[in-house]
Amino acid sequence: MAGDSEQALPKHSPQNGQPFLIGVSGGTASGKSSVCSKIVQLLGQNEVDHHQKQVVMLSQDSFYRILTPEQKSKALKGQFNFDHPDAFDNELILKTLKELMEGKTVQIPVYDFVTHSRKEETLVVYPADVVLFEGILAFYMQEIRDMFQMKLFVDTDADTRLSRRVLRDINERGRDLEQVLTQYITFVKPAFEEFCLPTKKYADVIIPRGADNVVAINLIVQHIQDILNGGLTKRQTNGYTNGFTSPRTRHPSDSNSSRPH
């Protein structure tokens, strides 16, 4: 398979008429959204009208809870933990994903990372054949995790993730360096180790180096195309191969545990 060639998404719908739901997890600034964007690009969906898209991408970041005045005051000082499971509106995430699986059009909140609040406008997402959902805790809640037919974990080293986060938060979110580093040490790193990293075991595919791993991403894209063509069943996706290592053996405890650790 050509490493960088774009491929057109097959016009066939999944066998059961429902979208193929893919969860993408990994630490902060690991490259989750870049991996999703690369998949969308390789499936030839970048320039497609939103009414006709067969692949859509959602971010867990859109579903941060509405903060109380006290929480918002802490957030503006960098003293609120946005990496904790309770920071997300998991009920709304679950409702949204279920509606997408039912072929419904949904409205996605738009979050303002500068003011730490939801904007008045929402993003309309139309039914699609493939739905990519990315987030640091995409696999944490079992009821959400069990909805994914494919689970990807973007595995990027801590130094790279920290440097990316510093640049992003300073350039895009108006933070200063001291605040970014304090928040990382106080909340981000401990939360990654406690809540995100343990969910890596649920991944069907682990992607070292994120979007730079062209081989792994091309394999994933081919796999998605096979599914859209009806070549593989949902059950067969559980044996899919890690980007560089051997296929995982899945144990009953993988799906029965309500918490990842």
UniProtKB/Swiss-Prot annotation:
One of its GO terms (biological process) is CTP salvage. Keywords: ATP-binding, Kinase, Nucleotide-binding, Transferase. Pathway: Pyrimidine metabolism; CTP biosynthesis via salvage pathway; CTP from cytidine: step 1/3; Pyrimidine metabolism; UMP biosynthesis via salvage pathway; UMP from uridine: step 1/1. Substrate binds at D83, Y111, H116, R165, R175, Q183. ATP binds at G26, G27, T28, A29, S30, G31, K32, S33, S34, D212. Residues 238-247 have a biased composition (Polar residues). One of its GO terms (molecular function) is cytidine kinase activity. It comes from the Eukaryota. Its EC number is 2.7.1.48. Residues 1-24, 238-261 are annotated as: Disordered. It is an enzyme of class 2 (transferase). It catalyses: uridine + ATP = UMP + ADP + H(+); cytidine + ATP = CMP + ADP + H(+). It holds the Pfam family PRK. Homotetramer. Belongs to the uridine kinase family. Phosphorylates uridine and cytidine to uridine monophosphate and cytidine monophosphate. Does not phosphorylate deoxyribonucleosides or purine ribonucleosides. Can use ATP or GTP as a phosphate donor. This is Uridine-cytidine kinase 2. It comes from Xenopus tropicalis (Western clawed frog). The lineage of its organism: Eukaryota, Metazoa, Chordata, Craniata, Vertebrata.
